[in-house]
Amino acid sequence: MSFNKLESFSNKEVIREEVSILTDLLTDVTRKILSPETFEKIAMMEDLAVHSKYQELKEIVEELTTEEMVYISRYFSILPLLINISEDVDLAYEINHQNNIDQDYLGKLSTTIDLISTRENAKEILENLNVVPVLTAHPTQVQRKTMLDLTNHIHTLLRQHRDVKAGLVNEKKWLGNLRRYIELMMQTDMIRDKKLKVTNEITNVMEYYNSSFLQAITNFMVEYKRLAEERGIKLDNPKPITMGMWIGGDRDGNPFVTAETLKLSATLQSEVILNYYIDKVYTLYRTFSLSTNLSETSQAVAEMAALSTDKSVYRENEPYRRAFHYIQSKLIQTLLYLKEGNFSNEGQRLTDRAEKTLSAKTTPSLSNKGREIIPNYIQSRISETLTELKKEETPSYKTAKEFKEDLQVIYDSLIEHHGEALVTGDLTELLQAVDVFGFFLASIDMRQDSSVHEACVAELLASANIVKDYSSLSEEEKCQVLLKQLLEDPRILSATHEPKSELLQKELEIFKTARQLKDALGEEVIKQNIISHSTSVSDLLELAIMLKEVGLIDENGTRVQIVPLFETIEDLDNSCETMEKYLSLPIAQKWIASKNNYQEIMLGYSDSNKDGGYLSSCWTLYKAQQQLTAIGDKFGVKITFFHGRGGTVGRGGGPTYEAITSQPLRSINDRIRLTEQGEVIGNKYGNKDAAYYNLEMLVSAAINRMVTHKKSDAHTSNKYERIMDQVVERSYQIYRDLVFGDERFYDYFFESSPIKAISSFNIGSRPAARKTITEIGGLRAIPWVFSWSQSRVMFPGWYGVGSSFKEFIDQDPENNLAFLQLMYKRWPFFKSLLSNVDMVLSKSNMNIAFEYAQLCEDQNVRDIFNIILDEWQLTKNVILEIEGHDELLAENTYLRDSLDYRMPYFNVLNYIQLELIKRQRNGQLTPDQEKLIHITINGIATGLRNSG
């Protein structure tokens, strides 16, 4: 049975009505800001764009003064943003509406659980499933937080308008509020003057927990258990969704991530979740006014109530209230101990700092960063409670388990005394939240490049006179040295090594901080350490040496899992050999056994794409998962995959449900992790309705892929794979011949794209390249993909696809085309692959791309565009042939209509950006005026709804 996507239920008429209102308001605001002459030019440009008269549009743009471009660029940047807001509101509305009328849609949780409810292992599947979205600081969110806040205000107003009956809306007041926020948008800086710091990235992401994640995940957990129980499946402690975090721990290529940012990330996360609990417990305190005159309580609740510092005579007969007051006091005390804690004392628990806190002369306060993300009313409540806490030494919680046990005491008492209806809602939700978030909120990954680990280990070995030049050893010799250190030498090599290099000192401090955080906040706070550019077993063992230095690993087990990240085509091809050797090591087997026999492997989508093109990347990743899963089976190890996907197709992006359900058979057991990056976080999780829906998609897709085994998968997979091997080999050659084989390509890319402006764009704390860029290989994947998106070529998402399939079809035109069409209908992987190419082609614009090619001064370099254009046309023709369609996006009319609506406006921005780049290169722009290029980058990314 097939279901429609939720987007297919969208109300296009309502969206157009809303956009018309928003556009009229924007037009009115703009008219009052600009001169009549400039405003008239905007009206002309808009009309020309809507009617695709781009040559005339180009001529007007060339005549604009730079001053006129300031507000014109803003106008055409805000227009697609307003369309996006209306579409997002419509999606959020439909999520609620379709659930209320019990309408099935693709990925609906109830339908998914129905699918497996009669299976013998249904309880095992639902109990053990764990899907982990990992939020990263990859710099693809071009919007300032201030602009995002204004966007949210407009979203809220539109949503309120839909939720209230038309006759009850004060239309004049509502329009006035909309106008105010649009006017603020038009006169607020859209881009950052200063580069983001890691601390900014941490606090920005924390906002999403307060606005969406905490409530959405809690609601999802309650619904997950309820749906299972309705079908006779009693779940004990499921965790279908938990959260991961890279910000503060991902130091690969980012020198600004330090031990301090790691500690800040962990402590701010704890502040956020503790304050969430404090707020929820306060709500329960206000709600549970049950009187002993009218109801009974358990002895345990009575004892807890007696410990409360709330001695008001008005509550002496309200034991539940006093019990919740006691719990709240303990939570506040826990928060204060966290803030006062000095993590330099290893092993110190939160409660061990009670005496220091209570004897402090001044009231402990939240950190400055904490104040940015914690609501004022909670800060006030904490301050009001401090006086009571100091009079009597209220204990704190050592662990989240203790907190849950206190809540469970109240829950059990209510059940025991006929309060089944009372426990539903806030109390049940809070119990579920504690299961998911603990006191840590999200597990922070640490990540570093393998070359850094090698340099640190080489220094340690040389300082101890073990090996003078470790880096010169062969792979076999390296492994021998490392294993001897891990198995036979108990020394902490860094203890006697002084002075240490700056690099080694920094790395050791981060690992020490990780241990201190685990000791203080629990094992869940940091669980994985990822090794970028993993190429060999020694890369994994070098990290083990670093972990050994701080006591996070020994010969019997590890407190942090070692996770290799295979990124390039070559590394992915060699990953099976690397992991087979690693899994055969007895010490590695003990480490894995200490992690319940799971071994995580991270897969890099971005670098493999830049290395070999879209088709080669996708297929290499697919085969690697198949082969690595088989190697895990050989050693009795459950291989789990961490998918390092970006927002764009060129970086592994695309529709989430299809991406997961098209993974190889058995590659998803009961765990899967995937990155959520940059602008994707806001698009998917910007409000609690959207967050719930996208979490539902993740979990439903994982369950479906775990249990769905189509006969066609096994029956025809060998033939499918042989065809893919042949096509991909040719695609790889075609891609590499141009990108790395044609000496003109480097100049073409840097001259025909806004890469220099993107590299100076303040959209993240991380540099645009790991080193000085002298070749394509040295450029990070994000600016690479971002630049091609801006120039509207979308090169990483399709180049090499057309020629490779055309050559295969031409070998036997009648049979080969028919078989590819069959593959498209029957093989989820192949359908997802081509659908993504279809989507990318629909966002490209070769007429605009031609204009960017004209930025190249040398005609010989400029001719590269003709190669790209020919391949684009061939790819489009082949894709449509295989799909059996006459136009792109024939199976995704929602996106097609959305792009048709938005595209004329951000097309205008491309022509403005082109003119600005020309003027910049001619020295006609001041440094301040050059920022206009960034505004156009922002607007185009907004229109495309993705960037890097």
Curated annotation (Swiss-Prot):
Write down the EC number.
4.1.1.31
**Reactions performed catalytically:** oxaloacetate + phosphate = phosphoenolpyruvate + hydrogencarbonate
Q: Which UniProt keywords apply?
A: Carbon dioxide fixation, Lyase, Magnesium
User: A single GO CC term, please?
Assistant: cytosol
Cofactor(s) listed: Mg(2+)
Q: Which InterPro entries match?
A: PEP_COase, PEP_COase_bac/pln-type, PEP_COase_Lys_AS, PEPCASE_His_AS, Pyrv/PenolPyrv_kinase-like_dom
Q: State whether keyword rRNA-binding applies.
A: no
Q: What class of enzyme is it?
A: lyase
Q: Which residues form the active site?
A: H138, K610
Annotated GO biological processes are: carbon fixation; oxaloacetate metabolic process; tricarboxylic acid cycle
Keyword DNA damage annotated: no
| GO MF terms, alphabetically ordered | magnesium ion binding; phosphoenolpyruvate carboxylase activity
> What is the stated purpose of this protein?
Forms oxaloacetate, a four-carbon dicarboxylic acid source for the tricarboxylic acid cycle.
The record's NCBIfam families line, in alphabetical order, gives: PRK00009.1
Please report which protein family the annotation says this sequence is part of: Belongs to the PEPCase type 1 family.
Q: What is this protein called?
A: Phosphoenolpyruvate carboxylase
Organism lineage string: Bacteria, Bacillati, Bacillota, Bacilli, Lactobacillales
- Gene assigned in the entry: ppc
